[in-house]
Amino acid sequence: MKPLMLQGHQRAITQIKYNREGDLLFSAAKDSKPNVWWSLNGERLGTFNGHGGVIWCLDVDWQSINLITGGGDSSCRLWDLETGKNIATLKSNSSVRTCNFSYSAYQAAYTTDKAMGHPCEVFVIDTRTIDETVSGQAPILKWEITDSKVTSMIWGSLDETIITGHEAGDLIQWDLRTGKKIHSVKEHTHQITDMQLSRDGTMFVTASKDHTAKLFDTNSLELLKEYKTERPVNSAALSPILDHVVLGGGQDAMEVTTTSTRQGKFDARFFHLVFEEEFGRVKGHFGPINSLAFHPDGKSYASGGEDGYVRVHNFDQSYFDYTFDYNRE
């Protein structure tokens, strides 16, 4: 299982994402230039130049036509994927922490940090036609977050809701017709660092600094499963073909210099989705894993770390042959 090492960033990776077909892999880092790679051979296709600071988030629409990025330069940008051109720039009052296209890509949402006297806010914009005029358009919907700030976000089913994960560990579901809260749960005790949907969108997995990842129902926010570790979890992803979930994390970045990689703190850890049991680990990064993504065909996965590398791992046949031992009575 020799990984591809993608080296195109000067600083720590913040988020990685595959497009729907899985032929492209996108990476965002703290060095202001998102990259796009061929996922098959690790060749870099290009960079998106324009941001003036750290990139916290990115997303690609289902047709792989446009890219959305958000960063510490208080802007959310829309890009033409083919040319790398910055089509529109949406200015905000503080850092853009999360951004996502809806499933249809008719809309996109992004959230800003509570900073510099400005509140944490959620914006929903119309992305049916993306051109220069988007920069001056008012959002379709915008609301203030009075609770702790949003640290992760996904779209709910049928593009009717948005689910936000917060610094205090809350999960809140919002109605997109009104911008009102539908309901909320608090199953985590610390910040929710990542949220990723299952392939069919019925479930999602959260990663948290409280040393757990948890599986929730998308519609009811009911807690289904819990995966426990001994250290903060920065990212978690669900396999599209098997009942597996992969977790990545480690200590906080500022403590990393004091530990050896031999301690296994920076491994990607595989758990069984149903039985909540860990069954495998993959070593590699020289620091915490900040972002994980399964390839849409489920035959490989990628990890982005604090060391600035993206590693693409293709699974061996033994991974697919492995079955969990349990009584079938």
UniProtKB/Swiss-Prot annotation:
GO biological-process terms attached to the record: formation of cytoplasmic translation initiation complex
Pfam families: EIF3I
Quaternary structure and partners: Component of the eukaryotic translation initiation factor 3 (eIF-3) complex.
UniProt cross-references to SMART domains, sorted A to Z: WD40
Sample GO molecular function, one term: translation initiation factor activity
Family of this protein: Belongs to the eIF-3 subunit I family.
Protein name: Eukaryotic translation initiation factor 3 subunit I
Species annotation: Bombyx mori (Silk moth)
Highest taxon of source: Eukaryota
Subcellular location: Cytoplasm
GO cellular component, one term: eukaryotic translation initiation factor 3 complex, eIF3m
Function: Component of the eukaryotic translation initiation factor 3 (eIF-3) complex, which is involved in protein synthesis of a specialized repertoire of mRNAs and, together with other initiation factors, stimulates binding of mRNA and methionyl-tRNAi to the 40S ribosome. The eIF-3 complex specifically targets and initiates translation of a subset of mRNAs involved in cell proliferation.
Keywords: Cytoplasm, Initiation factor, Protein biosynthesis, Repeat, WD repeat
